[in-house]
Amino acid sequence: HLGWWLQKSVGMNNRHAAINMTYTRKTKDQMAARVAQDIPEGAYVNLGIGMPTQVANHLPAGLEIILHSENGLLGMGPFPKEGKQDPDLINAGKQTITLLDGASIFDSAMSFGMIRAQKVDLTILGAMEVSEHGDIANWKIPGKMVKGMGGAMDLVASAKNIIVAMQQVNKAGQSKLMEKCELPLTGVKCVKKIVTELGVYEIADGGGFKLLETAPGVSIEHIKKATAGWLIVDENVKEMSL
């Protein structure tokens, strides 16, 4: 396992130094399209605030997938076209949405009752940091004012499966895939998979970011430089299909 150790060591040294990457970043829309490929037929799915909400526009045709929002919606459709927005229909991120036939609207108490009763099969969240053991930090930066943690803590404690969709490095050029989260945690050992503009990863048994797919045009060397935690690479890595 010497090769794995070396990859971990290189990544750790990059955490507090800006990473100068030369690849073209994939858009949030493209990441959302890749996440949508992992949603199974019949799943009840919560879409977190931010980029995860874009997944609604990329669900596979012909599959019945029920989207949930913690402000009290079940059965969301794609975003409305320009000029067709209804200001009374919004998701938890205050974005205008559409409702599919048979959709339901209810209060937050019922919505969180669904979450805590583990009726949600999959949650897709953004994050500021994810650790190599599947810990997630996505609600607070010390010293900055926040309104509250929102529904993320309930979701990570109750959802059966959690996928994180996020940029792999922050605005300072520092990796967000870490050995250990430095920001206040939202949940511990709960993340199963991560999709970034560089690739797709799963949390390996025993810890580590197992690289499953690389984004088109992105090399494994680039990914190593942008990963601060333990990166596991084997011969089965393939290119992401978008």
Language model features: what each stretch is:
Residues 6-7, 13:
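Generic alpha-helical structural signal
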Residues 1, 6, 20-30, 81-242:
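Conserved phosphate- and dinucleotide-binding cores of soluble alpha/beta proteins
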Residues 19-100:
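N-terminal active-site beta-alpha-beta segment that forms phosphate/nucleotide-binding
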Residues 10, 17-18:
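Acidic, Ala/Val/Gly-enriched low-complexity intrinsically disordered segments
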Residues 1, 13-14:
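Intrinsic-disorder-associated, low-complexity terminal segments enriched in Asp/Asn/His/Tyr and depleted
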